Amino acid sequence: MVSNLLKVVLAIETSCDETAVAVVRSDKQVLSHKVLSQKEHVVYGGVVPEIASRAHINYLYDLTSQSIEESGCDLADIDAIAVTSGPGLIGGLIIGVMMAKAISSVTNKPIIEVNHLEAHTLLIRMFHDIDFPFLVLIISGGHCQFLIVHDVGCYQRLGSSLDDSLGEVFDKVARMLNLGYPGGPIIEKKSIMGDSKSFFLPRALINRFGCDFSFSGIKTAVRNIVVNQKYIDNDFICNISASFQDCIGDILVNRITNAIHMSQAINCKINKLVVTGGVAANHLLRNRISICVKDNNFEVLYPPTELCTDNGIMVGWAGIENLSKGYVSNLDFVPKARWPLESIKRSS
């Protein structure tokens, strides 16, 4: 085990379209955090992998230098380097991992390969005193899944999306309505002014046992409505946005209820649900989820809204959690576009 002295971790996140670097300390202090959200993708209505990779190349070195300088540390003060190694866009992952390995090699500091989903999952422990085990729902642009978190590096999947991720569906619906990218915040804003009962959308799998998701049918239903709509004005956009959000809320409530029952059947000590990932920043969905969880005698916890999307702080904290267990990596690890959270294997 690593000693109980304060540890300082330099963290690098390049798994998608955010280039982020942070310096985080084991007493939960953020010494610096630099994040650059790439605006280049807006015109395309989604992330273009090649553009994302080139942007990481252009920004990562300067962001790393700025983050170290802002932290008041130098490389000698860093105890370890944590880097997102997957899942994600392979081009961006390679760039982040190469930078982290270079720093580790030059400084002879340990390196920790971090699973992006583990970083989202463990971040809650930086802000709340939550013990293992607990239930987590990850809802983001690339993932939608329930897992039991037994410990750092020990996860059990209960259910996941059978097709699209939830964040992906928000982006695609926003694109159908010419609302721009990212779609989630825009649809949430429009839905506030709309009538959620204007259009009926299918609630896939809602009457089935389990906690898997399917969102492709909702996406198709919205497309059919948009194609057949003669006039697409602001009222229509607000109403379809509200109907879409209401549909997603119904599905989440149903799936969360099932996941709670499944998790307690596995371990009756589980009484907390963590909701994380970019879609967890949606306050209308948070309200629906919070009511559902309370009705099921559970407690729900969310990371700070600004840290629901990808960031360096979560990678740094995951690095600290792994370092506290003595989990470090060899320099020969490779980035992985796919890396299921339940498949993590740790060695100290």
From Swiss-Prot:
It is found in: Cytoplasm. One of its GO terms (cellular component) is cytoplasm. It is an enzyme of class 2 (transferase). GO terms for biological process: tRNA threonylcarbamoyladenosine modification. Required for the formation of a threonylcarbamoyl group on adenosine at position 37 (t(6)A37) in tRNAs that read codons beginning with adenine. Is involved in the transfer of the threonylcarbamoyl moiety of threonylcarbamoyl-AMP (TC-AMP) to the N6 group of A37, together with TsaE and TsaB. TsaD likely plays a direct catalytic role in this reaction. Its main location: cytoplasm. Its EC number is 2.3.1.234. This is tRNA N6-adenosine threonylcarbamoyltransferase.
